[in-house]
Amino acid sequence: MDAAKYHIILIDAIGTGESSKPSDGLKASFPRYNYDDMVTAQYRLLTEGLQIDHIRAIIGFSMGGMNTWLWGIKYPNYMDAIVPMAASPCAMNGRNYITRKFISDSIRKDPAWQGGNYTEQPKSAQFATIYYNFATNLGTAQLVQKAPSYVEADEMVAKAFAAPYTVDANDILYQWEASTDFNPVGYQNIKADILVINSADDERNPIELGVCAKALNEIGHGTEFLIPAGPNTNGHATTFNANLWKDAFAEFIKNVPHGNQ
């Protein structure tokens, strides 16, 4: 997306970054939220706060990709295009949910969590985050290449634990539990042009399930750009490397009509 041509708006979703979150003061008294709440808040920010009545495209990765699917469903006339990356339009299920549950349960069952009203950060948050990152990220082939034996693997794990960890446990807990009821029902009614960008080695969105292909067939329009696994891919994190998909996106957005209403 050409920043000289378009205004690019980057939003910290509820519970993340500089947006409102438990660590701002309320701790466990902070209201629960889900992905639907995130999208509603983003829409109100754009329409009420910035007074923008139509946008060119909604683009998001992972959680942002799931938010992007919801955008297309909840506000079908608001954008010309949606570009969900590393995200499947289906209910949270299987390994994707189970591994997230490990994060929340490890924090909630940690005595140091104290019902969310701790004075020192429970160590379970760091442990669960590192586990989840290795389990559902980085790419299977890449991990084997970087850790061909237990020696290198031990070094990688030790390095991960030695790195500074400043994320608040309640913030992490709320963020992951926000995805629990994700279920983009009604995607068949999406009107915006669609470019789905996924990678063949995405651990959280296995291509063998065919979820995106099925959804696009039911929607009746849209394209999936699948990045083949290779030396420059990193599993779920593959789309961090824009060089792998920027040409496909540029060609797509060039052909999307303006002002889809």
Residue ranges: model-predicted function:
Residues M1-D37:
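Active-site machinery of serine-nucleophile hydrolases
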Residues D36-A57:
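Conserved acidic catalytic loop of the alpha/beta-hydrolase fold
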Residues G65-P76, I82:
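Short glycine-enriched nucleophile-adjacent loop
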Residues Y78-A162:
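Alpha/beta-hydrolase-fold enzymes
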Residues N170-G186:
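Active-site nucleophile elbow and catalytic-triad environment of alpha/beta-hydrolase enzymes
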Residues I190, V196-N198:
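Short beta-strand/loop motif that positions the catalytic acidic residue
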Residues E203-V211:
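Conserved alpha/beta-hydrolase "acid-adjacent" motif
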Residues K214, I219-Q261:
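Catalytic active-site module of serine/aspartate enzymes centered on a nucleophile-bearing elbow/loop
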